[in-house]
């Protein structure tokens, strides 16, 4: 993005320039890589090791690559996806429980300040928004932690009492008995996965319920007069959600992200709303730097810094 700021979104179709998993590496490079990673284990931060580690352990990339095993019949990728997806699910369930316990006597940051007369669509998996607004006012666009899917029948099954769920116990007592990869024929195997829609550009339909949810989300945006989008990057993998906003250009839309006024974010907004970067005017919104064009305001702020009630009133 620093070298080609104007063309970055067109040139970049993934988060990495190199796919290190598929490279043929020389012995010299392998030696340097090992030494670099060892340095990264020292107490002092090592930037190269951190970058390499982040790339090789990118959970989104791993989920995308391994989920495709269900479509190209690769048992090894399917097994890897089961492991990665349930590990991610277990981590999120444990962290969710930890956060809720830590804020048992106080409101959650950001979520605790969401006005209760709103309807909200979230692309996060955690239950924080539903805890604040209730299930009837919340749509989990990419699924959530409280359901899982049997892949051969597309049955969407609930996780009992997700807020108090012991993830290790659930995997041991529910997931393991429902997974069978012993047969060589994939059609004879049985897989259950968390109901988390992987970050593919072409979104898989894990269950018919998601068709209904995405239609309902579009209807909510259609009915709204003012839409506030918080902490969402509008990346290409979520083009199906971007298109919902694109199809309703007459709505007042506030977009709150720290990089809202940056060059690369403006280029992204041009793709979504069709408004050239030079059409935006600099303004202030509740004390924050912002840009405005037509009915769209780009507000440079973090989620916890904004007051949603004031934005709706302003």
Per-segment meaning from a language model:
Residues 93-102, 202-210, 232-234:
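Short, flexible loop segments at the rims of nucleotide/cofactor-binding pockets, characterized by
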Residues 146-157, 263-268:
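Short, charged, surface-exposed secondary-structure boundary motifs
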Residues 165-222:
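Acidic, metal/cofactor-coordinating or nucleic-acid-engaging core segments within structured domains
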Residues 1-129, 141, 146-148, 304-306:
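Gly/serine-rich nucleotide phosphate-binding loop at the start of the catalytic core
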Residues 152-162, 306-314:
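Short, surface-exposed amphipathic charged segments that create phosphate/polyanion-binding patches used
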Residues 107, 128-130, 236-242:
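Short, well-ordered alpha-helical microsegments
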Residues 1-16, 21, 210-314:
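SIR2/sirtuin-family catalytic core signature
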Residues 135-141:
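A short alpha->loop->secondary-structure connector
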């Amino acid at each position: 993005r620093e070298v080609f700021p104007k063309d970055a979104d067109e040139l970049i179709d993934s988060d990495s320039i190199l796919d290190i998993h598929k490279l043929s590496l020389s012995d010299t490079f392998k030696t340097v890589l090992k030494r670099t990673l060892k340095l990264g284990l020292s107490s002092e931060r090592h930037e190269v090791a951190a970058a390499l580690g982040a790339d090789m352990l990118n959970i989104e990339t791993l989920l995308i690559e391994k989920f495709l095993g269900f479509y190209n019949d690769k048992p090894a990728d399917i097994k890897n996806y089961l492991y990665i997806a349930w590990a991610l699910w277990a981590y999120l369930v444990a962290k969710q429980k930890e956060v809720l316990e830590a804020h048992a006597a106080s409101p959650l940051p950001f979520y605790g300040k969401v006005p209760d007369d709103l309807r909200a669509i979230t692309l996060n998996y955690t239950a924080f928004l539903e805890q604040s607004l209730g299930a009837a006012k919340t749509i989990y666009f990419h699924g959530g932690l409280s359901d899982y899917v049997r892949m051969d029948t597309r049955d969407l099954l609930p996780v009992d009492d997700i807020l108090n769920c012991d993830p290790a116990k659930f995997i041991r007592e529910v997931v393991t008995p429902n997974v069978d990869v012993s047969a060589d024929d994939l059609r004879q195997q049985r897989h259950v996965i968390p109901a988390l829609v992987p970050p593919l550009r072409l979104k898989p339909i894990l269950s018919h319920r998601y068709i209904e949810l995405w239609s309902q989300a579009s209807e909510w945006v259609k009915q709204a007069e003012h839409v506030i989008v918080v902490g969402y990057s509008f990346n290409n993998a979520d083009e199906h959600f971007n298109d919902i906003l694109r199809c309703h250009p007459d709505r007042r839309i506030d977009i709150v992200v720290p990089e809202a006024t940056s060059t690369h974010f403006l280029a992204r907004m041009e793709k979504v709303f069709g408004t050239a970067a030079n059409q935006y005017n600099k303004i202030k919104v509740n004390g924050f730097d912002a840009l405005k064009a037509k009915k769209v305001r780009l507000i440079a702020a973090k989620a916890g810094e904004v007051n949603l009630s004031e934005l709706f009133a302003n």
